[in-house]
């Protein structure tokens, strides 16, 4: 029953009890042995079965358009963190569809955690190519624009002392393209990323 319910959303085989392990990991937040030990005398696994069904039902209601990228997402963790919130599913679907079509998003599976958390790390935004970095470095003549603006003594850096940065951030519509690439010294790139 669990396999039929969740086969599109969870990796694993029911024969090797991987679905059970996934459900236990979700409900126990990874502390399976402690969860099992505390419930070893329970007459049944209704708590676990109810939780598992609730997670899958929440996924289906929150993201009604199924895509193969949904399989294997850590839905249990997302359910525990965001399952109590009400979402505009049409707006979520519009966002998911746009991100699925975005070539800069290399982790399509990460779209689902991203639309709930807002954390870009899940998307694995495409990095600038070596050629794009070199072109930006040459165009800037190795000068970090932030160092120059601050009037620092050292404004020119070797290419291996610099990192590529989106001039217009990806979240504001900036593309991972040569035109949107600038080279910053490591210090300024890290400072800019922390904002």
Task: Please identify what each model-predicted range represents.
Residues 105-152:
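Short, charged surface segments at domain edges that flank catalytic/cofactor-binding sites
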Residues 188-192:
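A generic secondary-structure signal for well-formed alpha-helical elements
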